[in-house]
Amino acid sequence: MNKIFAAFKPRGLSSNSFLSTLKKKYKNKKAGYSGTLDPFAKGVLIVAFGQYAKLFRFLKKTPKTYKATLWLGVYSLSLDDQNIKKIQNIKEFDLAILKQIIDQMQGIISYTPPQFSAKRINGTRAYELAKKGIEANLKPCQMEVFDCKILSYNHPFLNIEITVSEGAYIRSYCELFARKLGINATLSSLERIKEGKFVYNNEKSLNVLKYINLKPNFIKDLNKLENGAKIFVEELEFHDEGDYYIETEKYFSIINIKENTVKYLLNKVEKC
């Protein structure tokens, strides 16, 4: 079974645990997901079964949009509503000040991922080390904030919708936002509502070619594609170097053109 869709991961489960439930549901062990969500977060997770599980690197998965609730005045080791160490009753902020900081935090932002994150350290998730009291050596990263807006502010809770690049951590954004206010803050909720063009729609199977980040190419002799025969650049409509997909009625293949040579990256993937 080839299938790709946007699933909705519930809060409290790791992405791997959630995938295991989907494997049982669809009775298919050959599956994968893209865009790990921390256990604390919920929302859109791209899931694929069968041959489609090999397509993640070709998908357009950015930008990503989240809804988040910032809890102002709270210090948490994990920057969420777990591991809370201190709660302060702070004065309510002028909405104009909050909007000003949000406007300042657009574009490229440097940050360090939170200790309680899904980042891997020598094969182990950082949050698994953090639970044991082991501090991971996480390298500084960059994220791009494309857009951010305030949805509501009911002190001490600030609800925002934020659109960011791949690899961004909203908890780190929350931490940086709080520093500019001169306070502590943590997330009380986080939901991913969109990943590229992927949105949750009851696990409806999608036409993967509409979500793939590749240009189409064309060949007159489609039998070559069906048989996995060697293809020469001269037989293709487009000759520029790069990755392309070529489709037949029932299948599609992904090829790479480099130094006047055509190489199959994936061949004869059945359409669903």
From Swiss-Prot:
Q: Which terms under GO biological process does the entry name?
A: mRNA pseudouridine synthesis; tRNA pseudouridine synthesis
Task: State its Enzyme Commission number(s).
Answer: 5.4.99.25
Kindly give the SUPFAM superfamilies that the UniProt entry links to this protein. Pseudouridine synthase (SSF55120)
Provide the reaction this enzyme catalyses. Answer: uridine(55) in tRNA = pseudouridine(55) in tRNA
Q: Which domain of life is it from?
A: Bacteria
Task: Please give the InterPro entries that the UniProt record associates with this protein.
Answer: PsdUridine_synth_cat_dom_sf, PsdUridine_synth_N, tRNA_psdUridine_synth_TruB
Q: Which residues form the active site?
A: 38 (nucleophile)
Q: What class of enzyme is it?
A: isomerase
Q: Does the keyword Isomerase apply?
A: yes
User: What Gene Ontology molecular function terms does this protein carry?
Assistant: RNA binding; tRNA pseudouridine(55) synthase activity
Keyword Isomerase appears in the UniProt entry = yes
Keywords annotated in UniProt: Isomerase, tRNA processing
Q: Which family does it belong to?
A: Belongs to the pseudouridine synthase TruB family. Type 1 subfamily.
Q: What does this protein do?
A: Responsible for synthesis of pseudouridine from uracil-55 in the psi GC loop of transfer RNAs.
What the entry lists under PANTHER family is as follows: PSEUDOURIDYLATE SYNTHASE TRUB1, TRNA-PSEUDOURIDINE SYNTHASE
What is this protein identified as?
tRNA pseudouridine synthase B
